[in-house]
Amino acid sequence: MDIFSAIILGIIEGLTEFLPVSSTGHMILGAHLLGLSHEGNDTLKCFEVAIQLGSILAVAAMFFKRLIAEPSLIAKLIIGFVPTGLIGLLLYKHIKELFSPSVVAYALIIGGVVFIAVELLMRRKNPEKISFEAGSHDEIATISYKQAFIIGLAQCLAMIPGTSRSGSTIVVGLLCGLSRTGAAAFSFLLALPTMFAATFYDVFKNRELFISNSDNIYLFLLGAAVAFVVALFVLRAFLSFISKFSYISFGVYRIIIGAVFLLFVL
């Protein structure tokens, strides 16, 4: 891995981590196009953990004041994190074994179909909530503890590579009655405890790999910095986008990317 690859992959991570399109799938595709293989590539594995931290710090920076001002919101995030934390801890090894391009491809396509179906369903069943005039990211203050827990359960689906953490939580957020913007904002926030925990657990479990790759720390820091800047821009742009457009475009995009995987990566 070189500086150019670190920058490109940092951009891909920042662009896709919080969009419902599977950052894992795009990282595999990006690495493939750069001529990098995940098989036996310890440097790439460590790099991907590092740049995830850059992305999650963007959420922390964006919502820091909000979290400090609303302790109840922190409590809801903890409740939402509990299912994922427990299942992730118990099934860590099995989850890692699920990682393969074929699983990612099919998860992308299935997730795309689900997004389109849920969007169309909500237009019929709850048109007021799903209208473009409804909701804002301030809606997260009204989310109940029950809704937080249910959305947290949905986050467990993201342990299947290619499903997309944000995709699964946004879909269930919509089904729980949240607006497009409210579902997205809570999904972003729920990433804080989830991704921090996953990142530090990965570092702990693979500490020997990180120590052996200490010579590449400058690449890890560069990629994380790029991911942070790009993710900060994407978070704001995405909330603005979904206040004007539906999630159907993301569903279609997922299906296309899944098909690309089946044709060119497998």
Residue ranges and their predicted role:
Residues 1-266:
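Multi-pass membrane proteins that catalyze or facilitate reactions on polyprenyl-/lipid-phosphate substrates
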